[in-house]
Amino acid sequence: MERLAEAPAPAPLDHAPILLAEDDKNDIFLMGRAFDRAGIPNPLFVVHNGKEAVDYLSGAGDYANREKFPLPGLVLMDLKMPWMDGFDVLAWLRDQRQFDTLPVVVLTSSKLQSDIDKSRELGAYDYRVKPQRFDDLVRLLDDVRQCWLDERFNRFWMLTSDSSAAPPRQMPA
């Protein structure tokens, strides 16, 4: 696939939008409630399949207006979606230089080691299995947000690594 032009800089990470790529309406509803319960201040944008995720990230079609659909600071992505699955989106992202440091966290019901391995091979920063209990989902989302969008974490990363490398997969102690 063809590379896109340089993307505009995203918002400061602690308030950066989060893009959720999820096809299940019940999971979308629960995620929205869990975001509210966790007190996550980041705006949440939802796409319903992998093709919409690519369109959103590339600013194509309905997502061309960057004021209305700003670049996210974090992507939460299901694997099993119609039109284009999470693996296809990860492969597309790997070819898009401007998204080299965009954290993508796979959030799926699959516990298969092959899915975990393939996600990591394709560049996922993290892999989380959707919990069964709502309170566990709240904790998981808060943990993911703190790990990938917390300014303290990102300052640590910027000071301790070269800028071409992806941040580490775990929050420093």
Where are the predicted features?
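Receiver (REC) domain active-site loop signature in two-component systems and cognate sites
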Residues: 79-81
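Residue-level signal for the "D+5" position in two-component response regulator receiver
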Residues: 46, 83-84
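Conserved phosphotransfer active-site motifs of two-component signaling proteins
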Residues: 111-114
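Non-catalytic signal-transmission and effector/linker regions of two-component phosphorelay proteins
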Residues: 1-19, 25-45, 51-54, 58, ...
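Short, glycine/charged-rich "phosphate-handling" switch motifs in NTP-dependent
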Residues: 125
